């Protein structure tokens, strides 16, 4: 394990402390809660609720924390903050509350959560120990206020005289807990809680339907959006309700708010010395018979469990096996309809479910296992500690255990988070750490990496404490440490004393199913966010139309968002971090006011050109980290107000001639990490307001010429391309240019005066290029330039240029390495004088502005002597992983070098200073070497070296090749006259052996047209059948002479688009169009390249839209057409009918062929989720609605005391058994703790190293939580 620097340790320790918790099990009766069952006190005096938080073991805990507003401890409000006495924080451990002001004694702690309901926790604190007493859920905000004395006063329900009791509407005044404050503005006041976009559906409905506002009897006017300053007017907007203060007087003031369907809200405020203060907010409450009926407990869930139990009993032939279940079920059936206590109802449901699960589970002791598969639970703590390890949250709570016939066991565990940082994992078995088999499962992220991994390994005695071992790059682990378990971070692992027979999958898989699929999942999310106004568990068109302002749907794993087409009043929409594969064409058509749209990190492959047609108000559009391969012409033409556009991290390999039409106000364009080889001449012309462009990490050989026309540009980033020169750009036309980043390219020359007139330049970055000299005449007349020319081929610079370099260093330079290539027969040999590792270490140790520059190899070697170690060891001490790639490259027709052979040195190797490659063909070659570094799962090429060029006139085996070429050249010797010829052709993959799928899409008899001595190929394409769908070629390009094949056999070089001779048409004769595209070419013509006359191979680039829709990125393919010159003839042979050809002509005869899978799916009616239970209505509303009528009859009641008592006794017995089991688990836990204590006494020597690593691990989890920003990080 690499050492951790003192500076890093100090910084980390300042943010995260490694603490152990002490938990004492309550000796008092435990009031069960589904979410909170324990509270602990950490050594840094923080109350810890570990069952709620982003990494909680239950999915409910992971969701609940998101909506916590504050915490109240004995009437003292605690706010979320890292500093202050009355504060709390939520991190990977759970909720941590500052306990500095909490004295010894009994306390009540309320977690305030308006969406999911408050939780009241009672506990006793004594010294450094906490005893948990109870936790009770108080209900959501809409329900809980009926339980609090300060919310609703007692209600009187008068009754009519007569034989039938009729409940009249009784009214009292009650305080409203959601309207509690105001803020004073200039000539106005604001009630922020009276919010038309409130998450509370009652407040939201009341605000949106306000009909009148009066202040001291003066009727106020709705000013819509005008200023209310010093007026008798009001405005309701996104910040709340604003009132002008013109009608306010000194002393008490009364504000009455009337709203359709609601009783009036009366707010009292006082004014003194110009200051206005909130006093109260009240509203009349009423109780009707209808209300009373609505308070009847919902037994739907219990009845569902009763049906489940009935089915089990009916199916079980061995009635003794279900005797206990049957007896308890009968008691519940006899009395559940008379339950009036919600707690008793919940306990009854739990009793029945526990009995069912006990029957189904068939729990088995870990000491009595037979052959089979089991479900196992585990606990992972930091080594020699009671505090949970990060592994507890990074792995699924369930583990799979397989017991084989010979008694040996194998355990499988699923890593669900931070997988990109986890290098390896193992659990000690029989005193050693077995190598685990890692299986990547589930979905991939945008970089092609799997999010989840399953680790499987042998394990022995489950009854003892096991040591776990993790190798994590974020904790200093390196790939070179793999299987060196002494360098792994250790943790303590214990397993449950019983296992469950069978295996139903990991918990995350169960959670995924519960979330629903398609629109059902989106609907569930919207319901959870409070957008279901009528409480029926569904989202109607009307409810969707009521969604206004900002809507955050990021990181919910959504796949289908078509439901949002009715949400026409959204102005800001966050959809990043989901799994959306397509955007329905009309999805945003009604969102006329949409100003912000974030679709980052989804699975989009294609956007229809009309997607944003109706969104003229859009200002910011983020489409990065998707799989988009191309941009439709006119896609953005309606976005006249767009200012920010990010298309980074996609698969865009080509642009149409005018992809940015209409974006005259765009100021920032992100296009990094795509596959662009060139940008069309006019593509950037509409971007007249652009001041920032990022083209980094593409395959550009030149900057686009039109960039010089964008006079507003201030920043150009084009690093990590293949740019060889910049003299095609007149930078003098960019007067505002401030930053130019061209680092890591292949620029060898800077023309004189190229930046002479760019007086606004503040930064020029040419790091890691091939510059041999830098003259003063290149730069403007400025004092400093922040010029970076490190890692070039520069031997010296003038004092003026040295001043422009500023705090950067000039050394090291690449020429120091002296990488040289030479031809030796049929081999190219290389030799290098100075290691890549030394160049890298030299740069790293002099990178800081305060570091002294080393200007010679001798000074660097002196540094090594002072360090007293070799370069490999020094880099390992810096926690760097690296590899070295050595490539043989050949020059292609486009001037770029293509790698045709390579060697990879991995696992922190020494540099290979000498070596050789075998040659295959004539051409221009060079050697390229690159150092690839990896830190914290981020890998990049840091520095490269190139040798001199080697010209090979004839390759090996040239005599044999000449014979082949001479045979093919006989075609030319015939001196073909102008005319039409025919020959056979087939389509091959780049391995030149396998048949390409496109082989089924061509007429295998191609036409050779000779015109004025120039040969052209004409190829007829056909429809290609994919399953039941029919697709067509979208575009065809061919590689010109001089192309080269890379290591994978893929051609690299310049391409030209083939000429379209004719298009496919439909039955009406119009150009064929379907959901994937239109104007599909049928016959195409291309010039026959000279190389094809020699080897019969024509390299092509084809794009098939339907293939890309089926599998992202698969639509654009490189293939070879193989020509059979032996079949050349002047007679057009009849085309043999092919059985796998889906269509013999260009006409479609069925409209079904035009329908894609989505069109057919849209014809089906989507299934809606079942309706939620009605729940309690007006009595528990924070805002009372007006009565719509009175009940005519009160339901008669019956009371069977014996049955109710029998049920209560059954519940009490069940709770007692649970408490007994809990006490036993506590005793076992104490025993394990004592065992660990004995181990700890023997492990003091490694303790300090452990705390160092543990501290770093805690910090990295916190930091990465912010970086990754995933709501479902540790699922």
Curated annotation (Swiss-Prot):
Domain NEAT: 369-501, 976-1138
UniProt biotechnology annotation: Given that Shr is pathogenically important and that the protein-protein interaction between HID 2 and host hemoglobin is the first step of iron-acquiring process by Shr, small molecules or antibodies that bind at the binding interface could act as candidate antimicrobial agents and inhibit this important nutritional pathway.
Single GO molecular function: metal ion binding
Record membrane topology: Single-pass membrane protein
Superkingdom of source: Bacteria
Residue segments, region HID 2: 203-269
Effect of residue 55 to A: Disrupts hemoglobin binding
Signal peptide coordinates: 1-26
Basic and acidic residues bias spans: 1196-1205, 1210-1229
Free-text activity regulation comment from the record: May modulate heme uptake according to heme availability. In the presence of high heme concentrations, NEAT 1 facilitates fast heme delivery to Shp, whereas NEAT 2 serves as a temporary storage for heme on the bacterial surface. When heme availability is limiting, heme from NEAT 2 is transferred back to NEAT 1 and from there to Shp.
Binding site for heme: 87, 196-197, 238
Entry annotated with the keyword Signal: yes
Keywords linked to the UniProt accession: Cell membrane, Heme, Iron, Leucine-rich repeat, Membrane, Metal-binding, Repeat, Signal, Transmembrane, Transmembrane helix, Virulence
Compositionally skewed regions (Polar residues) per UniProt: 1138-1166
LRR repeats (start-end): 544-567, 568-590, 592-614, 616-638, 639-662, 664-686, 687-710, 712-733, 734-757, 759-781, 783-804
Compartment annotation: Cell membrane
Transmembrane feature ranges: 1250-1269
InterPro entries (UniProt xref): EF_Hand_1_Ca_BS, Leu-rich_rpt, Leu-rich_rpt_typical-subtyp, LRR_dom_sf, NEAT_dom, NEAT_dom_sf, Shr-like_HID, SLRP
Its job: Hemoprotein receptor that plays a central role in the acquisition of host heme, a source of iron during bacterial infection, and is therefore an important virulence factor. Captures host hemoproteins and their iron-containing heme molecules, and transfers the heme to the cell surface heme-binding protein Shp. Plays a pivotal role in iron acquisition and growth under iron-starvation conditions. Uses a cap and release mechanism in which Shr forms a dynamic complex with hemoglobin that enables the gated release of its most labile heme molecule.
Protein's name according to its UniProt entry: Streptococcal hemoprotein receptor
Gene source species: Streptococcus pyogenes serotype M1
């Amino acid at each position: 394990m690499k050492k951790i620097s003192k500076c890093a340790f100090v910084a980390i320790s300042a943010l995260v402390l490694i603490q152990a918790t002490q938990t004492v099990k309550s000796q008092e009766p435990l009031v069960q809660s589904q979410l909170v069952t324990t509270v602990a006190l950490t050594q840094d005096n923080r109350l810890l609720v570990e069952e709620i938080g982003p990494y909680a073991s239950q999915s409910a805990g992971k969701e609940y924390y998101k909506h916590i507003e504050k915490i109240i401890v004995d009437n003292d409000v605690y706010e979320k903050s890292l500093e202050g006495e009355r504060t709390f924080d939520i991190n990977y451990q759970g909720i941590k509350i500052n306990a500095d002001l909490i004295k010894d004694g009994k306390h009540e702690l309320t977690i305030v959560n308006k969406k999911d309901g408050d939780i009241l926790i009672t506990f006793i604190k004594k010294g450094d120990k906490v005893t948990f007493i109870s936790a009770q859920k108080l209900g959501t905000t809409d329900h809980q206020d009926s339980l609090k004395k300060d919310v609703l006063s007692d209600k009187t329900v008068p009754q009519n005289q007569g034989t039938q009791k009729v409940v009249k509407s009784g009214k009292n005044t009650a305080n409203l807990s959601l309207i509690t404050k105001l803020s004073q503005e200039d000539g106005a006041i604001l009630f922020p809680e009276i919010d038309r976009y409130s998450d509370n559906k009652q407040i939201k409905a009341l605000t949106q339907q306000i009909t009148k506002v009066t202040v001291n009897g003066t009727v106020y006017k709705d000013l819509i959006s005008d200023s209310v300053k010093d007026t008798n007017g009001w405005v309701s907007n996104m910040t709340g309700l604003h009132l002008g203060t013109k009608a306010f007087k000194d002393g008490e003031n009364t504000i009455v708010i009337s709203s359709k369907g609601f009783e009036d809200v009366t707010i009292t405020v006082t004014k003194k010395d110009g200051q206005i203060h909130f006093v109260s907010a009240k509203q009349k409450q009423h109780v009707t018979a209808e209300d009373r009926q609505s308070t009847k407990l919902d037994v739907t869930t219990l009845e569902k469990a009763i049906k489940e139990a009935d089915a089990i009993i009916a199916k079980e032939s061995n009635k003794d096996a279900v005797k206990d279940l049957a007896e308890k079920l009968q008691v519940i059936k006899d009395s559940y309809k008379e339950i009036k206590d919600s707690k008793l109802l919940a306990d009854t449901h739990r009793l029945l479910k526990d009995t069912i699960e006990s029957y189904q589970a068939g729990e088995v002791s870990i000491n009595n296992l037979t052959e089979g598969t089991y479900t196992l639970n585990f606990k992972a703590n930091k080594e020699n500690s009671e505090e949970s390890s990060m592994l507890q949250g990074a792995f699924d709570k369930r583990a799979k255990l397989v017991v084989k016939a010979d008694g040996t066991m194998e355990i499988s565990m699923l890593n669900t988070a931070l997988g990109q940082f986890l290098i390896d994992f193992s659990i000690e078995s029989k005193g050693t750490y077995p190598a685990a088999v890692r299986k990547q499962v589930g979905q991939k992220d945008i970089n092609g990496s799997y999010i989840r991994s399953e680790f499987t390994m042998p394990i022995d005695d489950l009854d003892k404490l096991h040591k776990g071992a993790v190798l994590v790059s974020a904790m200093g682990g390196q790939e070179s440490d793999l299987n060196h378990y002494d360098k792994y971070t250790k943790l303590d692992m214990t397993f449950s004393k019983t296992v469950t027979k069978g295996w139903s999958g990991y918990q995350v898989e169960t959670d995924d199913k519960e979330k629903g699929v398609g629109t059902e999942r989106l609907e569930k999310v919207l319901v959870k966010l409070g957008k279901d106004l009528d409480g029926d568990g569904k989202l109607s068109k009307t409810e969707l139309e009521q969604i206004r302002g900002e809507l955050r749907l990021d990181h919910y794993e959504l796949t289908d968002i078509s439901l949002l087409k009715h949400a026409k009043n959204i102005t800001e929409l966050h959809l990043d971090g989901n799994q959306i594969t397509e955007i329905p064409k009309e999805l945003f058509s009604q969102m006329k006011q949409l100003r912000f749209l974030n679709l980052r990190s989804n699975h989009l492959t294609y956007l229809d050109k009309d997607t944003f047609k109706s969104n003229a108000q859009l200002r910011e559009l983020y489409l990065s980290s998707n799989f988009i391969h191309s941009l439709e012409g006119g896609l953005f033409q309606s976005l006249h107000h767009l200012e920010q556009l990010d298309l980074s991290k996609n698969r865009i390999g080509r642009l149409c001639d005018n992809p940015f039409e209409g974006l005259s106000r765009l100021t920032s364009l992100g296009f990094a990490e795509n596959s662009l080889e060139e940008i069309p001449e006019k593509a950037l012309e509409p971007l007249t307001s652009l001041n920032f462009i990022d083209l980094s990490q593409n395959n550009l050989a030149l900057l686009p010429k039109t960039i010089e026309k964008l006079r507003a540009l201030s920043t150009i980033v084009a690093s990590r391309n293949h740019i060889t020169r910049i003299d095609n750009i007149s930078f003098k036309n960019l007067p505002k240019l401030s930053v130019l980043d061209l680092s890591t390219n292949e620029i060898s020359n800077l023309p004189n005066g190229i930046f002479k007139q760019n007086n606004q330049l503040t930064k020029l970055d040419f790091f890691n290029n091939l510059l041999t000299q830098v003259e003063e005449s290149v730069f403007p007349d400025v004092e400093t330039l922040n010029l970076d020319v490190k890692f070039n081929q520069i031997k010296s610079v003038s004092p003026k240029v040295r001043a422009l370099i500023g705090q950067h260093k000039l050394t090291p330079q690449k020429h120091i390495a002296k990488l040289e290539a030479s031809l030796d027969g049929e081999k190219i040999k290389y030799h290098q004088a100075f290691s890549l590792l030394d160049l890298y270490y030299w740069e790293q140790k002099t990178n800081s502005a305060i570091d002294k520059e080393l200007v010679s190899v001798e000074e660097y070697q002196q540094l090594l002597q002072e360090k007293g170690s070799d370069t490999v060891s020094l880099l390992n001490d810096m926690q760097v992983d690296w590899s070295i790639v050595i490539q043989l490259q050949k020059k292609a027709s486009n001037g770029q070098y293509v790698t045709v052979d390579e060697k990879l040195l991995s696992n922190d190797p020494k540099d290979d200073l000498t070596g050789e490659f075998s040659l295959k063909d004539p051409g221009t070659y060079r050697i390229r070497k690159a150092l690839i570094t990896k830190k914290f799962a981020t890998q990049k090429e840091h520095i490269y070296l190139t040798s001199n060029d080697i010209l090979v006139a004839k390759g090996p085996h040239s005599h044999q090749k000449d014979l082949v070429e001479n045979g093919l050249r006989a075609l030319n010797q015939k001196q073909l006259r102008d005319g039409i010829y025919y020959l056979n052709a087939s389509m091959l993959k780049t391995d030149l052996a396998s048949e390409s799928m496109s082989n089924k899409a061509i007429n295998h008899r191609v036409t050779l047209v000779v015109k004025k001595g120039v040969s052209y190929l004409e190829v007829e394409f056909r429809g290609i059948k994919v399953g039941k769908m029919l697709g067509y070629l979208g575009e065809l390009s061919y590689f010109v002479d001089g192309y080269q094949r890379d290591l994978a056999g893929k051609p690299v070089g310049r391409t030209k688009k083939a000429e379209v001779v004719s298009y496919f048409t439909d039955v009406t004769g119009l150009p064929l169009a379907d959901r994937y595209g239109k104007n599909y070419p049928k016959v195409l013509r291309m010039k026959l390249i000279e190389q094809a006359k020699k080897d019969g191979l024509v390299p092509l680039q084809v794009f098939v839209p339907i293939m890309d829709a089926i599998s992202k990125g698969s639509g654009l393919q490189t293939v070879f057409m193989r020509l059979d010159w032996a079949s050349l003839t002047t007679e057009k042979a009849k085309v043999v009918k092919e059985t796998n050809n889906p269509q013999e002509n260009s006409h479609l005869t069925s409209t079904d062929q035009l329908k894609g899978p989505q069109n057919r799916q849209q014809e089906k009616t989507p299934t809606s989720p079942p309706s939620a239970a009605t729940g309690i209505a007006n009595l528990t509303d924070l805002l009372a609605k007006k009565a719509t009528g009175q009940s005519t009859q009160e339901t008669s009641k019956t009371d069977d005391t014996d049955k109710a008592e029998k049920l209560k006794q059954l519940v009490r017995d069940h709770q007692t058994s649970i408490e007994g089991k809990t006490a036993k688990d506590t005793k076992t836990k104490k025993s394990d703790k004592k065992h660990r204590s004995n181990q700890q006494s023997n492990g003091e020597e490694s303790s300090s190293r452990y705390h160092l690593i543990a501290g770093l691990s805690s910090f990295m989890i916190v930091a990465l939580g912010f970086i990754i920003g995933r709501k479902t990080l540790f699922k």
